[in-house]
Swiss-Prot record:
(6S)-5,6,7,8-tetrahydrofolate binds at L116, G120, H121, L122, E240, S348, P349, F350. One of its GO terms (molecular function) is pyridoxal phosphate binding. Homodimer. It catalyses: (6R)-5,10-methylene-5,6,7,8-tetrahydrofolate + glycine + H2O = (6S)-5,6,7,8-tetrahydrofolate + L-serine. Catalyzes the reversible interconversion of serine and glycine with tetrahydrofolate (THF) serving as the one-carbon carrier. This reaction serves as the major source of one-carbon groups required for the biosynthesis of purines, thymidylate, methionine, and other important biomolecules. Also exhibits THF-independent aldolase activity toward beta-hydroxyamino acids, producing glycine and aldehydes, via a retro-aldol mechanism. The modification N6-(pyridoxal phosphate)lysine is found at K224. Coiled coil: none annotated. The record marks H223 as: Plays an important role in substrate specificity. The keyword Cytoplasm applies. This is Serine hydroxymethyltransferase. Keywords: Amino-acid biosynthesis, Cytoplasm, One-carbon metabolism, Pyridoxal phosphate, Transferase. The lineage of its organism: Bacteria, Pseudomonadati, Campylobacterota, Epsilonproteobacteria, Campylobacterales.
Amino acid sequence: MSLEMFDKEIFDLTNKELERQCEGLEMIASENFTLPEVMEVMGSILTNKYAEGYPGKRYYGGCEFVDEIETLAIERCKKLFNCKFANVQPNSGSQANQGVYAALINPGDKILGMDLSHGGHLTHGAKVSSSGKMYESCFYGVELDGRIDYEKVREIAKKEKPKLIVCGASAYARVIDFAKFREIADEVGAYLFADIAHIAGLVVAGEHPSPFPHAHVVSSTTHKTLRGPRGGIIMTNDEELAKKINSAIFPGIQGGPLMHVIAAKAVGFKFNLSDEWKVYAKQVRTNAQVLANVLMDRKFKLVSDGTDNHLVLMSFLDREFSGKDADLALGNAGITANKNTVPGEIRSPFITSGLRLGTPALTARGFKEKEMEIVSNYIADILDDVNNEKLQKNIKQELKKLASNFIIYERAMF
């Protein structure tokens, strides 16, 4: 029996989502379009298999084939990131980070991470997160120019003496200097933990410096710029840390791994290892630079005055409208983005004075410089007259026509 016959409600809603993804423009920096081959194996019989433990050391029988699958995922991950050890079992980036903390430090120890309001992530010590409740957290941020001042980070680290320093961000448009972070970590005797969830796809293509050999441990999601399934990974070059990480993930915070997702990670890694991937990642950065240049030419303020990666962060501190207003206006025109706090923020986190835009998903559809210039100018048109609903409606129709030339999926399920 087909899904349409068995559960028409879910079938219809899934197809409405297909329509939304195909007709609109996805510009949330953390979202992307994965391969049909990835989704195909995620919907396979591998979802039936329990496999607590690790390859060759399972608590259940019948794991000979899933052992081979997980081993393949591990080997591809190691090759991709040029590291010695990899754990591919984390169900998400947040659980990967939780596993890193559990492996490296003890509850109550101090961690130093980027402030959430400056572009960090919840799991880097934010008080509302378990990372900010189980561990004592302190923060560094960006200056008013939107960039990390590494001397300021050094001063904070020397004062706070953390056991672990987290480098990585969810809304930082510039290159992260992992070597400088390692210098600082060594000076205070801390572990350096790099969370590259947002930039991993650029890193493996040589479009952003690698955290190796500087970081003791590296985590990432497998979606975002990697375009794989939703999930997490942890990597290191230290055998003893690898053992601690494995124990922290299982049996520490997870039980049976999601073997259908681990297989999908392996498929994604195969794509990431291809020459085609390097072309894609380069275009992601090129498209982001086109976006940044058009917006600046149209007199909009960007945090750090540009971008080195896949995203731009707009600041509306000099405007009458908020990030929430901008988010809504773009949404009415068929562009999905997200409001975001900015350095010098004057509004609440639920309103904000910024907007984060990313190019990974549009690039996955085949958008290049020509299309990005069109889209970027439409964004500027909308934000120049943010309350003009008629304009938003007209632009939505124009963008729908543009999107129809770049269909990413022909069907909702694979």
